[in-house]
């Protein structure tokens, strides 16, 4: 699909289609949707930040909130190498030497009135964030130097950034920090919620495996380890595969312990449940 802005034809990105849903922690969903609300014709939507450890569900929450609003969702993965043109418009040379201007997922969301997720936003440099400064205040536009155009955001456009709390990230400049508000912190889910998430992602898993993984995660959370439900899903999935390919009867616990070591490392075994169920 293409649109024309100030005489320049832009080729738009496709929305992301993911089969995921947000489970539990309804208050976090309420806070995100509230930040995006417009309560008066003079009001503006906010640009929230979702903060937390890797794997706690920040992107899942953002995507599910966008879909709950009935909007298309566009995800832009930020990296250390993300340039301003990657965020906005990229020129591509076609046959015959002609230039084709390709809109980023973020700019496509701006034009179409969708939801833009800047994933792991604090991996981007200040130069890249600076190109978004006018979008994040009451101006709500960006300027593409490459294409020589100004692009205004659709009234229905919404933006959210997810950010990990690890060391391999940049500090946000203050003028961006003040524009990405409110800050919504996502912590580890409660036991019942964690069980529900595992069951949603591993519907073919036996209850004993789900319970074992939940016990492991809850013990790790209590010790302030960084293991997340994403790690639990990987452990459970790998254990099921190991058990299904075994040439002899294999204890579930044996398969789970192998999976824990190979997904998280031997030090994670300190949080395993040592009672071994019968082989099956």
Question: At which residue positions do the language-model features occur?
Answer:
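AAA+ P-loop NTPase catalytic core and its hallmark functional loops
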Residues: 1-211, 278-280
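Residues that form generic nucleotide/phosphate-binding pockets
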Residues: 197, 201, 212, 216-219, ...
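Conserved AAA+ ATPase small/helical "lid" subdomain
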Residues: 202-254
């Amino acid at each position: 699909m293409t649109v024309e802005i100030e005489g320049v034809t832009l080729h738009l990105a496709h929305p992301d289609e993911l089969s995921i849903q947000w489970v539990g922690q309804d208050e976090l969903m309420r806070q995100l949707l509230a930040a995006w609300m417009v309560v008066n014709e003079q009001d503006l939507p906010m640009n929230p930040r979702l903060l937390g450890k890797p794997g706690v569900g920040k992107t899942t929450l953002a995507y599910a909130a966008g879909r709950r609003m009935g909007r298309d969702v566009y995800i832009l993965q930020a990296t250390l190498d993300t340039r301003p043109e990657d965020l906005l418009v990229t020129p591509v040379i076609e046959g015959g030497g002609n230039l084709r201007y390709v809109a980023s997922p973020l700019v496509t969301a701006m034009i179409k009135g969708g939801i833009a997720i800047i994933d792991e936003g604090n991996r981007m440099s200040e130069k890249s964030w600076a190109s978004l400064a006018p979008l994040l205040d009451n101006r709500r536009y960006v300027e593409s130097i490459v294409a020589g155009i100004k692009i205004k955001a659709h009234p229905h456009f919404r933006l959210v950034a997810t950010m990990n709390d690890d060391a391999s990230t940049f500090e946000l400049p203050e003028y961006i920090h003040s524009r990405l508000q409110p800050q919504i912190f996502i912590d580890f889910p409660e036991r019942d919620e964690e069980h529900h998430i595992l069951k949603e992602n591993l519907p073919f898993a036996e209850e004993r495996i789900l319970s074992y993984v939940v016990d492991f995660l809850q013990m790790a959370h209590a010790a302030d380890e960084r293991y997340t439900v994403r790690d639990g899903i990987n452990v459970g999935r790998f254990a099921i595969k190991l058990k299904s390919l075994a040439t002899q009867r294999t204890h579930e616990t044996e398969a789970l312990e192998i999976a824990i070591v190979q997904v998280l490392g031997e030090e994670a075994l300190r949080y395993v449940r040592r009672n071994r169920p019968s082989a099956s």
